[in-house]
Amino acid sequence: MVALTLALAAATSSAEVLHVRVVDSNQDPVPQVAIYVEQSGTSRAARAPASAVMDQRYKRFVPHILVVQKGAQVSFPNSDVVAHHVYSFSRPNNFVLPLYKGTPPDPVRFDHDGVVTLGCNIHDSMLGYIVVVDSDIFAISNEDGVARLDVDSDAAQWTVHAWSPRFRNTREPLVRTIMAGEALTVTFALEKKLRPSHDDHTESVLWNDYD
């Protein structure tokens, strides 16, 4: 009976594409922004969390920003020839992977939504982020500052969130709300100057953002 109910729910909910664009104060596109959508009023049941990978290559976390659904398990392979000691102080998702090469046998499960800041106890320049969201609809903006997300057409409301370590306020994401019947297009136009990108090797200032 449960399987039949889920099948009927899936059949009555079709997808539409929500377009999100992020631009800075000069109207230039902002890539590598975590975008996720919470929707209400849909008949579709949320998908189960998918596993994900946060690699380490050339003494960098790859990808720099990873978005996962709450409850997802993330593996941390080390593709470098040197050992890494990966950790996060971001409570309640804090964890430690002591000095290792290769791939740890067990992935890390993230059961709480929020931003998880990653570091390496051996290489201080290594900095990465896992954005844990209570949604199965998420993406990263491309080089044009654009993300396209499949949302359920029968939803009554879509709440769109945007987060980047380059935003001046990294504590909370930017939020926009779309109601049923409105255009599925959102532009986040940033008013404040962005922090330098991690490629500039200056983003370590964000270590001070820990609670």
Q: Which sequence ranges carry the predicted segments?
A:
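Structured interaction patches on ligand/partner-binding surfaces of diverse proteins
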Residues: K101, V133-S141, R166-T185
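A short, solvent-exposed beta-strand micro-motif common in secreted/extracellular proteins
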Residues: I35, Q73-N78, L118, A155-R166
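Short, ordered, surface-exposed loop/turn motifs in non-cytosolic proteins
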Residues: N26-R44, V81, D124-M126, D154-A156
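A short, Gly/Thr-enriched small/hydrophobic beta-strand-prone motif that recurs across taxa
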Residues: T12-S25, L194-D199
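A short, solvent-exposed loop/turn motif at the edges and junctions
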Residues: F61, V81-V96, H123-M126, A162-P173
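A short, amphipathic beta-strand motif
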Residues: L18-D24, I35, F76, G145-A147
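Short, acidic Ser/Thr/Gly-rich low-complexity loop/linker segments typical of extracellular
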Residues: A46-R60, V67, L99, F138-D144
